[in-house]
A protein has these predicted regions:
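Acidic, low-complexity intrinsically disordered regions
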Residues: 1-147
């Protein structure tokens, strides 16, 4: 079953024309990309970052949230949930499938932004980079490689 809708909302080039502001950023941890878990842990301090209509509460612990990919314009449907045991928020639903589809790894970064003009929520990922240092007798060189 596909993890995204077959409908493309917009041409990805048009994303640059939108007035997006970042509401959430996280460097992925091993538990965020774990095969045993299907969730992105969001700090409880980020309550409301996806807008008041998309925020879980003790009465409504799971809220369906559609997000649009900044890279390809596709819609992804997740569930924004509340863990009442510790008050943390999670993005779940098809999170594991999203990680697999995007080949996300520990150290990659997820960025969620909102368009205030129409309330759409946008998601993108940034690949982690590693720095390799090569030392020789006379010089030191620094390389950046994309994972």
């Amino acid at each position: 079953k596909p993890i995204h809708a077959d409908v493309v909302m917009t041409d990805p080039e048009n994303v640059a024309e939108r007035q997006l502001h970042e509401v959430f950023r996280k460097k992925l941890t091993s538990s965020d990309v774990s095969r045993q878990q299907d969730r992105l842990l969001m700090a409880k301090e980020r309550r409301g970052c996806l807008g008041k209509h998309n925020t879980p509460s003790p009465e409504n612990r799971d809220v369906n949230v559609d997000m649009w990919d900044e890279c390809d314009g596709r819609k992804y449907s997740f569930v924004h949930g509340l863990w009442t045991s510790n008050g943390s928020y999670v993005l779940k639903g098809k999170w594991r499938s999203f990680c697999d589809f995007k080949c996300l790894n520990v150290g990659d970064t997820i960025v969620i932004s909102m368009d205030d003009s129409d309330g759409t929520i946008w998601i993108r990922h940034e690949r982690a980079t590693i720095e390799l240092t090569r030392r020789s007798n006379t010089s030191s060189m620094l390389y950046a490689a994309s994972l």
